[in-house]
Amino acid sequence: MPFGGTVSSDDYFAGTRAAACGGTTTVFDFALQDFNETMTDTFNRRNALAAPDAAVDYSFHIGVKDIHGDLLDSIKDACDIGVTSYKVFMVYDFGVKDGVFYQLLAKSKEFGALIAVHAENNELVNTLTEKYISEGKTDAWYHYMSRPEFVEGEADERAINLAKAANAPLYIVH
């Protein structure tokens, strides 16, 4: 499975067979959107990998990386084919900006979709990461230290306020 420039050793057959052995009959995977790709195209690309090999029922949450203009409107088409769960990121360089996040929340409500959010303040994470790297502090512990509680708390509060303003449901993943 492709992810973040790497390929995992797992595939849909191995993963869904393991699920079936454990008694799980339906799985949801994250299909991470490529840049300039509609939500439907993201679904179709990932579905092409799963369909030939899945041993149980499956569906996808679309991981939103690029959402503007026509791509924002593509949520309707994806909802029309049954994709009603989307994950946005407030962190990472591709993270959604607040104005676009608000628009996506409003669109999701209109079409009955649910937005999940990975909420962290990207600027603070980057600032703290750069600080620790410049000090030579690169052990795994400093990954944790570069993401203190307030970094997530601030972004959670912002996401909740945007959802309230859009009168839309929101799922905070962690």
Describe each region flagged by the PLM.
Residues 24-26, 56, 81-84:
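Short acidic/polar active-site loop segments enriched in Thr and Asp
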Residues 1-10, 31-33, 57-70, 90-93, ...:
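Active-site mouth loops of central-metabolism enzymes
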Residues 1-53, 70:
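Metal-associated gating/positioning segment near the N- to mid-region
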Residues 40-60, 103-120:
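Alpha-helix-loop-beta-strand connector modules within alpha/beta enzyme cores
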Residues 70-174:
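Histidine/acidic residue-rich metal-binding segments in metalloenzymes
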Residues 27-28, 59, 116, 171:
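Structural detector of well-ordered beta-strand residues that form the stable sheet scaffold
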